């Protein structure tokens, strides 16, 4: 379930690995001298990961999922998290499992009936977060955590990422919980990289991810006659749908009284009066189904959570 992570290998508590060995695996690294605190940081890339080495620590930052799979559309499982951390250790020549985790993005995709943006209006208030729709995504922000819902296929295409065959023709709703800092506080434990694939910690992370989603207010859906119409509405269908919705809301009896008043005032003749009575009666008998759009996502998110337990 992890995507972007930030790891810190602190030399105060761990023996520094040979700098030359670590840097030999990095592409096009650069050196930055900071004279005010007498540090020199050398930074390069290991595949998609950014790796920085200075006289105090090694920092690893980037998508662990993309490092392991070559893309971050697939979900990183507990086992694949272990494999990715071990691969990093073998490559860089030190035990990456001993790194402190200072950031972890917890995420997965669910395949939905509609494009993801259809579901955003049904996700409402969340205490102590600022809700912010932005460029086809929905953000919830606070100082140490961030939630984002977005269209993962659209995001991958925009970044020129290769989309796995099984996802090419799907609508992928992405729910991502970003633990930006204070990770130890959020999980009530010191979190090392090796803990990310520990069963107890992995379950705890999944529980936090799920609880955060369930804490979001789910806005009630209005009864919507348009959901009874065809998937693609032409002008005639739309006109009929809106008329039917209005009749349901005003009430057939009230419409009868209004039509009768118009007839008595001579504004419509008797023929039109009876024709409209029949037309509105037929429309009033069209069944309305409740559009439980967000229930689909609720169910899918719950299924992901239950699969972790």
Q: Could you describe each region identified by the protein language model?
A:
Residues 1-254, 286-294, 301-309:
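Structured, helix-rich domain cores that form ligand/interaction pockets
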Residues 278-285:
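Residue-level detection of the helix-turn-helix DNA-binding "recognition helix"
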Residues 259-268:
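Short, aromatic/basic-rich helix-turn unit that serves as a nucleic-acid recognition element
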Residues 270-277:
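Helix-turn-helix DNA-binding segment
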């Amino acid at each position: 379930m992890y995507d972007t992570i930030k790891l810190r290998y602190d030399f105060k508590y761990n023996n520094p690995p040979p700098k030359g060995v670590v840097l030999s695996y990095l592409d096009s690294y650069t050196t930055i001298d900071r004279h005010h605190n007498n540090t020199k940081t050398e930074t390069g890339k290991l595949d998609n990961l950014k790796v920085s080495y200075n006289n105090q620590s090694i920092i690893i930052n980037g998508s662990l999922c993309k490092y392991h799979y070559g893309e971050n559309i697939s979900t990183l499982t507990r086992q694949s998290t272990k494999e990715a951390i071990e691969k990093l250790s073998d490559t860089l020549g030190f035990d990456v499992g001993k790194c402190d985790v200072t950031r972890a993005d917890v995420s997965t995709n669910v395949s939905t009936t509609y494009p993801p943006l259809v579901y955003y209006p049904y996700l409402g208030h969340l205490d102590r977060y600022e809700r912010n729709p932005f460029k086809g995504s929905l953000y919830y922000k606070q100082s140490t955590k961030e939630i984002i819902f977005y269209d993962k296929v659209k995001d991958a295409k925009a970044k020129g990422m290769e989309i796995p065959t099984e996802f090419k023709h799907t609508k992928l709703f992405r729910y991502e919980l970003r633990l930006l800092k204070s990770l130890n506080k959020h999980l009530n434990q010191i979190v090392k990289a090796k803990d990310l694939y520990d069963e107890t910690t992995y379950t705890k992370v999944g529980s936090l991810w799920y609880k955060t989603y369930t804490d979001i207010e789910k806005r009630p859906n209005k009864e919507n006659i348009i959901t009874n119409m065809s998937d693609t509405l032409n002008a005639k269908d739309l006109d009929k749908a809106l008329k039917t919705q209005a009749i349901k809301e005003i009430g057939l009896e009230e419409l009868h009284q209004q039509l009768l008043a118009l007839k008595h005032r001579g504004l419509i003749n008797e023929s039109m009066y009876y024709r409209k009575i029949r037309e509105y009666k037929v429309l009033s008998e069209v069944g309305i189904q409740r559009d439980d759009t967000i229930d689909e996502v609720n169910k899918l998110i719950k299924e992901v959570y239950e699969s972790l337990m």
